[in-house]
Amino acid sequence: LVEGFQYGSLGFKQIDGGGKTGFDKRDYLAKFRVNTNPEAKTYQSLTFKIGKATETSHETYLGLTEDDFQHDPYRRYAGSQKDLMETEQSQLSATHFINLSRSFHITTTVYRSDFSRNWYKVDNVTDSAGVKTSIGKVLEDPASYQEAYSILTGASSSNLNALAVRANNRSYYAEGIQSVLDFNFITNDISHDINIGLRYHKDEIDRFQWDDLYAMNNGVMSLTTAGV
């Protein structure tokens, strides 16, 4: 069995000055099974599964001020032009099934899953006086942070490191093995099904993120300081 699913969109918002706002997602899965004759005294099967999924989304955390939203809810500020979400996932598993009798069967699965993602998105603005302000505060009260608001909307910045774009980088994995014994029987016309399982599991997350700094020049962001 092989399956594939792809979908995407060009997006429905418009960035000041132009830019991508859509997404592309791809998901693939393959399964393969070998087994003994179904009529065999001890039936066994071995199933392999492999999967791969990716996503590229030109999505942002940056919203709009109340007034700008009322005027055009589909607008995106120029300060979000670099925002990008990228993800990748892979999974592997092998499952062994053995039917010992009408009442007993054992299912054992070995598995591994890996997932990584990086949401690269504007985080804060630093004005010409060196005052750093989060994007949330700017949008809540643009009148108090007029210079920061102007930079977000595309006005040229005198500060070369005006916009901080954070790489929210993560990677995860999970792996393990589990066995389940299924025991079923009937007593006095009552059917019983008992499962006894044992699992060894391990998972981990690795988080490494950094900030790249940009200047805004007439609606175009230019990298000035690369994060490490």
Where are these regions (language model features)?
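Outer-membrane beta-barrel translocator domains and adjoining extracellular loop/strand segments
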Residues: F12-K20, H58-D67, W119-V125, R207-L213
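Surface-exposed loop/interface segments of Gram-negative outer-membrane beta-barrel transport/assembly proteins
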Residues: A40, T47-D72, T224-V228
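Transmembrane beta-barrel wall of Gram-negative outer-membrane proteins
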Residues: L1-G8, D16-H58, T87, T95, ...
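Glycine-rich loops and low-complexity Gly/Arg-rich segments
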Residues: V2, K25-A30, H71-R75, V131-G136, ...
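Extracellular loop and loop/strand-boundary signature of outer-membrane beta-barrel proteins
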Residues: F12-D27, R33, Y77-K82, Q91-T95, ...
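A short local loop/turn or secondary-structure capping micro-motif enriched for an aromatic residue
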Residues: S9-G11, E55, F115-R117
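Face-selective signature of the C-terminal outer-membrane beta-barrel domain
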Residues: E39-K41, L46-T47, T87-V228
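Flexible, solvent-exposed coil segments and beta strand-coil junctions
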Residues: E3-Q14, D67-Y77, T87, I151-L163, ...
